[in-house]
Curated annotation (Swiss-Prot):
Any coiled-coil regions, as ranges: none
Keyword Transcription regulation on entry: yes
Source organism per UniProt: Pseudomonas aeruginosa (strain ATCC 15692 / DSM 22644 / CIP 104116 / JCM 14847 / LMG 12228 / 1C / PRS 101 / PAO1)
Amino acid composition bias (Acidic residues), ranges on this chain: 196-218
Recorded family membership: Belongs to the sigma-70 factor family. RpoD/SigA subfamily.
PANTHER family xrefs: RNA POLYMERASE SIGMA FACTOR RPO, RNA POLYMERASE SIGMA FACTOR RPOD
Record function comment: Sigma factors are initiation factors that promote the attachment of RNA polymerase to specific initiation sites and are then released. This sigma factor is the primary sigma factor during exponential growth.
Domain of life: Bacteria
Sequence segments annotated as region (Sigma-70 factor domain-2): 383-453
DNA-binding region range list: 577-596
InterPro entries cross-referenced by the UniProt entry: RNA_pol_sigma-70_dom, RNA_pol_sigma70, RNA_pol_sigma70_r1_2, RNA_pol_sigma70_r2, RNA_pol_sigma70_r3, RNA_pol_sigma70_r4, RNA_pol_sigma_70_non-ess, RNA_pol_sigma_70_r1_1
A Gene Ontology BP annotation from the UniProt entry: DNA-templated transcription initiation
Protein name: RNA polymerase sigma factor RpoD
Region named Disordered: 170-220
Length: 617
């Protein structure tokens, strides 16, 4: 049975079940649909066709009363017709190889988010970041480094935004979404191009890292960092007095984490702390791998035995002795490698002393940090996937500007991911309102950087866009193209600068651009090559060479060679008197005499008449 016949059979079974039950659920419809159908609009069309047959589709199985109200009959012919129609729908969309359609089809499988859904995902992102910050606070030296940077900025009068970007307190209160005028993403108006240029200019001129606020409140930052500093001192005293595993130290470290984790660090600071914790784990892993290779690969110790015996004994120098007590068959090899194993264990002990943590504590802190990162990463992924349609709707406005549509989409996706990182749901705006500007800026910046063969700086792109906009306005006002002088007066710019901008704004043209209807003719065929000689010049040059050779043939061999070397005839370059003298092993004065004698011979009318015609030309 062919694939299409099988699909029709499955769809007939679905319709038969609907006739028998009197209804279908969305889950049943989804289970019987072909796998290639994933676009929500296609699914809605299929459900509408099933409804037209008299079979109602419910979210969940309805009760008996609802079935009585919605009861309807279907016939066999209608079932076959619907199955054939559904199979035809599948065949139309299931075989596309267009990357844009495939991307949109996959994108359509993700449902749009409500305002509540956006807040829920944003809270999960913040929760993941707080878990990472809580784990970082447990690592010695991390909080100290942030406090040192904060104190340095306060002392030097720097910007707080170089350290932190805000706070993520774990409260449930959030402002309601404001009634913001929706962004018009359709390109229907007559002045849409002018609006696009204005938007592009404003997007390019904005700083990519500026969120439009004045940064963190200095007073609130002072209070928070003071509390963190005081709690850090308490934690250090408890650690010194009672040890890390004590109840007192654990309580103080927990309090430190509670104060530190709401601080939202800038990416540079956050990544530096994460890298610091990761570095300690990588050091542990490197020594553990070295010990495992010595035991498993070199000593032929079974891997299962190593994984059973080695954990929790990473720095125990008596571990080798405990392994040898059972006298395994690999005991002799282990004994032979004892010194190498002890050397790596000592490196682990030195690492523990350096970071003031045991190997188990380093692993536990990294595990907690990884869990928080994974939680935030999953939530960000959901937010990005649910807003991919927004990127496409914005990217459509910027087609035919030098970048392919898929490139525009990917650049917009980069802006979308940055918007997810910086989104603050407590401000009350919907995510789409905030993300629109990041997406638009990412797209316009990429067009400015990549669209032109010869890259033009962004500030010059702004000037070109402004010039084009004013030029169109003056064209509508005057009914003709404005002159550079008129543009300069309107833009308050010197005329020479206007001419430079107009020259820069010109797009390069490919030499392979076809000319006319004949595909064999290209623009390069009609452009003069100034480096090539004309046929007449080439013929004259060849005739001059031949005449010169004939004239030189009338001299002695020595005189001819001296002239050839002195004037570079049939050579790459000419030579000085001294260079020619070395060649003939005579003085430069003698070469000058030979040259003068040869030139007198050439000036004789019998010889000079052959070359005089070239001089006249």
């Amino acid at each position: 049975m062919s694939g299409k016949a099988q699909q029709q059979s499955r769809l007939k079974e679905l319709i038969a079940r609907g006739r028998e039950q009197g209804y279908l659920t969305y889950a049943e419809v989804n289970d019987h649909l072909p796998e290639d159908i994933s676009d929500p609009e296609q699914v809605e069309d299929i459900i509408r066709m099933i409804n037209d047959m008299g079979i109602n589709v419910f979210e969940t199985a309805p009760d008996a009363d609802a079935l009585l109200l919605a009861e309807a009959d279907t016939d066999e012919a209608a079932a076959e017709e619907a199955a054939a129609a559904l199979a035809a729908v599948e065949s139309d969309i299931g075989r596309t190889t267009d990357p844009v359609r495939m991307y949109m089809r996959e994108m359509g499988t993700v449902e749009l988010l409500t305002r509540e859904g956006e807040i829920e995902i944003a809270k999960r992102i913040e929760e993941g970041i707080r878990e990472v910050m809580s784990a970082i606070a447990q690592f010695p030296g991390t909080v100290d480094s942030i406090l040192a940077d904060y104190n340095r900025i306060v002392a030097e009068g720097g910007r707080l935004s170089d350290v932190l970007s805000g706070y993520i307190d774990p409260d449930d209160g959030s402002l309601p979404a404001e009634e913001v005028e929706p962004v018009n993403l359709k390109d229907d108006s007559a002045d849409s191009k002018e609006k696009d240029d204005e938007e592009e200019e404003s997007d390019d001129s904005s700083d990519s890292d500026d969120e439009g606020d004045g940064g963190p409140d200095p007073e609130e930052a002072r209070l928070r960092f003071t509390a963190v500093s005081e709690q850090l001192d308490k934690a250090k005293k408890a650690l010194k007095k009672h040890g890390r595993g004590s109840k007192q130290a654990t309580a103080e470290l927990t309090g430190l984490a509670e104060l530190f984790m709401p601080i939202k660090l800038v990416p540079k600071q956050f990544d530096a702390l994460v890298a610091r914790v990761r570095s300690a784990l990588e050091g542990v892993r490197a020594q553990e791998r070295a010990i495992m290779q010595l035991c498993v690969r070199d000593a032929r110790m079974p891997r299962a035995d190593f994984l059973r015996l080695f954990p929790n004994h990473e720095t125990d120098e008596k571990w080798v002795d405990s392994v040898l007590k059972s006298k395994p068959k690999y005991a002799e090899a282990i004994e032979r490698l004892r010194d190498d194993i002890l050397r790596n264990q000592q490196k682990l002990a030195a690492l523990e002393s350096e970071v003031e943590l045991t190997v188990a504590e380093i692993k536990e802190i990294n595990r907690a940090m990884s869990i928080g990162e994974a939680k935030a990463r999953r939530a960000k992924k959901e937010m990005v996937e649910a807003n991919l349609r927004l990127v496409i709707s914005i990217a459509k406005k910027y087609t035919n500007r030098g970048l392919q549509f898929l490139d525009l989409i990917q650049e917009g996706n980069i802006g979308l991911m940055k918007a997810v990182d910086k989104f603050e749901y407590r401000r009350g705006y919907k995510f789409s309102t905030y993300a629109t500007w990041w997406i638009r800026q990412a797209i316009t910046r990429s067009i400015a950087d990549q669209a032109r063969t010869i890259r033009i700086p962004v500030h010059m792109i702004e000037t070109i866009n402004k010039l084009n906009r004013i030029s169109r306005q003056m064209l509508q006002e005057m009914g003709r193209e404005p002159t550079p002088e008129e543009l300069g007066e309107r833009m308050d710019m010197p005329e020479d600068k206007i001419r430079k901008v107009l020259k820069i704004a010109k797009e390069p043209i490919s030499m392979e651009t076809p000319i006319g209807d004949d595909e064999d003719s290209h623009l390069g065929d009609f452009i003069e090559d100034s480096t090539m000689q004309s046929p007449i010049e080439m013929a004259t040059s060849e005739s001059l060479k031949e005449s010169t050779r004939e004239v030189l043939a009338g001299l002695t061999a020595r005189e001819a060679k001296v002239l050839r070397m002195r004037f570079g005839i049939d050579m790459n370059t000419d030579h000085t008197l001294e260079e020619v003298g070395k060649q003939f092993d005579v003085t430069r004065e003698r070469i000058r005499q030979i040259e003068a004698k040869a030139l007198r011979k050439l000036r004789h009318p019998s010889r000079s008449e052959h070359l005089r015609s070239f001089l006249d030309e």
